[in-house]
Amino acid sequence: QSRGLGDVYKRQVWIAYEPVWAIGVNGIPAPVEYAQEKHHVIRETLRELYGEAADVVPALYGGSVNLENATRLFVQPDIDGLYVGRVAWDAKRFAGLIADCLATGEK
């Protein structure tokens, strides 16, 4: 679906991946290795379509991101950021998640 994107729009596009079984209150978080693997496929597919220009398109992971898995997801080489939901409902928890990710020194 992204084949028709022009060079100008590539810089305005973000890709967010969330496994269907990780969505919602009863969602089950994906193992970190699974999320990294899927993001690697996303990154390689974008490179096949757009070459090196694809490296400017951020690929975010969402899907039951929480305080327990956020930093492990955040440091993965093909995950450019996190697309969070419920954890952001509580400002203190969200601030804690951000602080924990920033403390990794990554990204």
Give a label for each model feature:
Residues 1-9:
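Single conserved hydrophobic/aromatic residue that forms the stacking wall/gate
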Residues 7, 37-49:
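Alpha-helix-loop-beta-strand connector modules within alpha/beta enzyme cores
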Residues 13-17, 55, 59-63, 80-84:
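Hydrophobic faces of well-ordered beta-strands that scaffold small-molecule active sites
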Residues 19-23, 65, 88:
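Active-site-proximal loop/turn and secondary-structure-junction residues that shape catalytic pockets
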Residues 27-38:
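Alpha-helix N-cap and loop-to-helix initiation/capping positions
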Residues 48-54, 104-106:
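Short helix-capping segments at alpha-helix termini
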Residues 65-78:
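Catalytic cores of alpha/beta
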Residues 88-107:
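C-terminal helical cap(s) of enzyme catalytic domains, especially alpha/beta-barrels
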